[in-house]
Amino acid sequence: MEAFLGILIPFLGTTLGAACVLCMKKSLGNLVQRALVGFAAGVMVAASIWSLLIPAIEQSAPMGRMAFFPAFVGFWIGVLFLLALDHLIPHLHVGSEQAEGPKTKLGRTTMMVLAVTLHNIPEGMAVGVMYAGFLAGSEQITAASALVLSLGIAIQNIPEGAIISMPLRAEGQSRGKAFAGGVLSGIVEPIGAVLTILAARLIIPALPYLLSFAAGAMLYVVVEELIPEMSQGRHSNVGTVLFAVGFSVMMVLDVALG
């Protein structure tokens, strides 16, 4: 039950953020959107390091000087996995006019939702891996550390939910449809978490690889999508400052509560 509630927390964050479209009249300003994206990127980088890569290396400590190997391999598989999805799935990033991936007749709205869904996959996997480790009795992963990651992902999902629902509204969608689009973009997280838990419980020795896999996938999203988004438009340091704020928040949560 504890794990079930934990994997739902990030989805609730997305839903809360998407609900902004129901009470806000105007679309997000460019500066506000860059600030929100910067914050989300900071949280994801900190989570990748403190909650995923470091535990992956600690779990491999019996390997001695080769303790880095599972984290190294898993990290690169995660990067290549997202790179493959990036080329195989048609999607359109918020604020961009150029679609990515194979040519398609899908509408702008659908491709915008697919873009956010694409980068929610590693977040769901990250939460799933943490809870799989906790359920398996891993010494490095506690209920508190798994909950901290869920809370961190949920916090950064709030601005992400708004970032997808508000542009959908600006594209001409009704408030209800824009809200639904924001919510649907996050539904992949609990699904990914459950599937990862089911897979990880069958291959517990692979947990260091799975943890670093999720980290690699998340960092790919940050560099490929979020950093360019927070740098769009006139020069401003707001995205960078909020990146540092997001990183600090997640680091404090992980160290103080995990």
PLM regions with names:
Residues 1-258:
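Intrinsically disordered, metal-sensing/regulatory segments
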